[in-house]
């Protein structure tokens, strides 16, 4: 399987990941479980690569996935310019401990400066 199931139905998984990628690009740092963060990282790297391409088709592909027009604008203007010289590795995972309720490993996923 080329993706993580995350214990969710396919439509719910897609929605959770789209929201998380949008939040990460907007806030530049979010806290989530380790498994979700690894999947968010994979998708965010793809979105930033689209932003670096910068053509109309890439913008439309990103807009189809990202849930906010303001975030798409930020991706193509600010974030893509920041990573112009970097080939991949745009995000970092920092382990922050375990969630109190169920002991799930938590991480902070953030954009590399």
Curated annotation (Swiss-Prot):
Which HAMAP family does the annotation name?
A: Ribosomal_bL17
GO biological process terms, alphabetically, are: translation
- Keyword Ribonucleoprotein listed: yes
Q: Name one Pfam family in it.
A: Ribosomal_L17
List the GO cellular component terms.
Answer: cytosolic large ribosomal subunit
Q: How does it assemble?
A: Part of the 50S ribosomal subunit. Contacts protein L32.
Underlying gene: rplQ
Protein name per Swiss-Prot or TrEMBL = Large ribosomal subunit protein bL17
| PANTHER family per UniProt | LARGE RIBOSOMAL SUBUNIT PROTEIN BL17M, RIBOSOMAL PROTEIN L17
* GO molecular-function terms, A-Z: structural constituent of ribosome
Q: What are the protein's UniProt keywords?
A: Ribonucleoprotein, Ribosomal protein
What family does the entry list?
Belongs to the bacterial ribosomal protein bL17 family.
């Amino acid at each position: 399987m080329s993706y993580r199931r995350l214990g969710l139905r396919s439509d719910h998984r897609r929605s959770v990941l789209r929201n998380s990628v949008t939040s990460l690009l907007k806030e530049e740092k979010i806290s989530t479980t380790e498994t979700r963060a690894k999947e968010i990282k994979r998708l965010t790297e793809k979105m930033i690569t689209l932003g670096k391409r910068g053509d109309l088709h890439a913008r439309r592909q990103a807009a189809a996935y990202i849930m906010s027009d303001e975030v798409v604008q930020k991706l193509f203007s600010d974030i893509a310019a920041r990573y112009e010289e970097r080939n991949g590795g745009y995000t970092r995972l920092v382990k922050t401990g375990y969630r109190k309720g169920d002991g799930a490993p938590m991480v902070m996923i953030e954009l590399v400066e």
